């Protein structure tokens, strides 16, 4: 899926994308993260998608925007989508008891007066069920079959009464997958393929566990240990809890699912759910006591900085993934990593923080006169990475100036320096920084070699040398 070049080429958007790219690559390199892939979606277009580092370190196979990752619990959002399709088709109701569709379901409990577990409870994680089925599969990675999972219910009991507390449960969503099968008459994987993936054109997405030797799949790695070592992570098939955590996809393919969330109108074709049902899934159905977070139908909903977002994260051995959507801005960010210590949530939050406002600004200016001075194309010769013994810096082309950032910082925009050209002085700029420690007002001078390439930069009285990579 090609990025939306018209929006990505707007100076303010391009500058913010360069910052995201520089920050992600720096964070990846300093943390030793093998690889990562990200995509940013606005409404029905992919604004930007890229890979960083390695899909397979040993084979030197780069991570790209098309690299596939195990998305683990993001699978739950597809299971919820299937449930709502079946609800809209009249095959079930959200407040149906679980036992109505799964007559074999029974679990002990000490809450005799509690309402029976319903399908809605499964999707909102308010069923009170245990987090997992009755097996230690996160220890030995021997996931039970659906049959063994059902047999194991006889050894389990509900932890809480229904509707008393939000309690995340893989078991609940595994049972929701069983409901999909019972209500549709199709195996879960076939239903998702035929009714969700195919209509959305998600050709690179797999419902069942992938072949570990698939050349398009990112290799899974464990966390980095105190001695700096990082070994491979085990390949797993989640079997009986597949409806909770088994799918595989790329950031560009998952972008198609993100685009669905912004659509409206009746169901049909790629509109696999009517707009009103999508809104129903995306609104709060269970609110946390702090009123800052809640749960929709399959989606985690957060409120921060005056903005509401929804989405889901995923975690399987060797993979950490995140899908986050800001409906008011029609913005979605997807991040996938191939190690146990990846931090895709911070990646999506930073990307939204840096790119969201410029996209909104670019759209607002699309039909208005833009009097801002465009950056001089000759400034591209200064763009690059620089290093001193004290730290790193990256020079980027902004919307009307050069930007100098330290991409190794957790939030480099807190220390950004804008470089304004000094008239009549070649290769010379003036530092414009809000932080008084950051050489504000001093000269920034680039030195070039005979070929016109920047070799170092003087900031104030001290130098950083140009480097090819971190």
Where are these regions (language model features)?
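Short, small/polar residue-rich loop motifs at catalytic or cofactor-binding pockets
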Residues: 32-35, 317-320, 391
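Short, conserved catalytic-motif segment at the N-terminal edge
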Residues: 10-71, 93, 104-108, 146, ...
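Short, surface-exposed loop or secondary-structure junction motifs
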Residues: 54-56, 110-325
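Active-site SXXK
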Residues: 21-24, 44, 68-95, 173-181, ...
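Acidic/histidine-rich, surface-exposed loop or edge segments in extracytoplasmic proteins
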Residues: 2-9
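Short, well-ordered beta-strand elements
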Residues: 311-312, 322-339, 457-459
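Peripheral terminal and inter-domain segments
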Residues: 307, 328, 345-470
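A short acidic/small-residue loop/turn micro-motif
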Residues: 54-57, 317, 340-342, 410, ...
């Amino acid at each position: 899926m090609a990025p939306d070049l018209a929006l990505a080429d707007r100076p303010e958007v391009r500058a913010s994308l360069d910052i995201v790219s520089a920050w992600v690559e720096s964070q990846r390199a300093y943390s030793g993260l093998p690889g990562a892939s990200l995509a940013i979606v606005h409404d029905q277009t992919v604004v930007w998608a890229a890979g960083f580092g390695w899909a397979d370190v040993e084979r030197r196979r780069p991570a790209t925007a098309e690299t596939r990752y195990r998305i683990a619990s993001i699978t739950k959002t597809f299971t919820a989508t299937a449930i709502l399709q079946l609800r809209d088709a009249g095959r079930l109701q959200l407040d149906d008891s679980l036992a109505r569709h799964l007559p074999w379901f029974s679990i002990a409990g000490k809450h005799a007066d509690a309402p029976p577990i319903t399908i809605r409870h499964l999707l909102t994680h308010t069923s009170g069920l245990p987090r997992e089925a009755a097996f230690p599969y996160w220890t030995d990675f021997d996931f039970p079959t659906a049959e063994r999972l059902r047999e194991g219910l006889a050894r389990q009991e509900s932890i809480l009464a229904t509707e008393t507390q939000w309690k995340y449960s893989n078991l609940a969503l595994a049972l929701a997958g069983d409901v999909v099968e019972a209500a549709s008459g199709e195996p879960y994987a076939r239903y998702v393929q035929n009714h969700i993936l195919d209509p959305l054109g998600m050709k690179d997405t797999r419902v069942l566990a992938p072949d570990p030797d698939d050349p398009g799949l990112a290799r899974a790695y464990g966390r980095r240990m105190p001695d700096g070592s990082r070994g491979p992570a085990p390949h797993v098939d989640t079997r009986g809890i597949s409806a909770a955590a088994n799918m595989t996809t790329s950031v560009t393919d998952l972008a198609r699912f993100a685009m669905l969330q912004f659509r409206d109108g009746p169901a049909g074709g790629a509109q696999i759910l009517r707009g009103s049902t999508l809104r129903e899934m995306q609104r709060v159905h269970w609110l946390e006591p702090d009123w800052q977070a809640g749960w929709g139908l399959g989606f985690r909903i957060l409120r921060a900085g005056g903005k509401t977002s929804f989405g889901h994260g995923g975690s399987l051995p060797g993979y950490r993934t995140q899908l986050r959507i800001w409906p008011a801005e029609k913005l979605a960010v997807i991040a996938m990593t191939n190690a146990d210590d990846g931090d895709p949530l911070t990646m999506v939050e930073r990307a939204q923080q840096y790119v969201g406002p410029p996209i909104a600004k670019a759209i607002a200016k699309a039909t208005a006169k833009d009097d801002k001075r465009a950056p001089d194309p000759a400034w591209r010769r200064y763009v690059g990475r620089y290093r001193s013994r004290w730290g790193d810096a990256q020079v980027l082309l902004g919307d009307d100036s050069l930007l100098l950032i330290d991409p190794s910082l957790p939030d480099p925009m807190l220390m950004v320096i804008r470089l304004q050209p000094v008239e009549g002085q070649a290769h010379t700029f003036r530092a414009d920084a809000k932080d008084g420690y950051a050489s504000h007002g001093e000269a920034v001078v680039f030195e070039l070699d005979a070929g016109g390439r920047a070799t170092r930069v003087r900031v104030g009285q001290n130098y950083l040398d140009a480097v090819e990579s971190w």
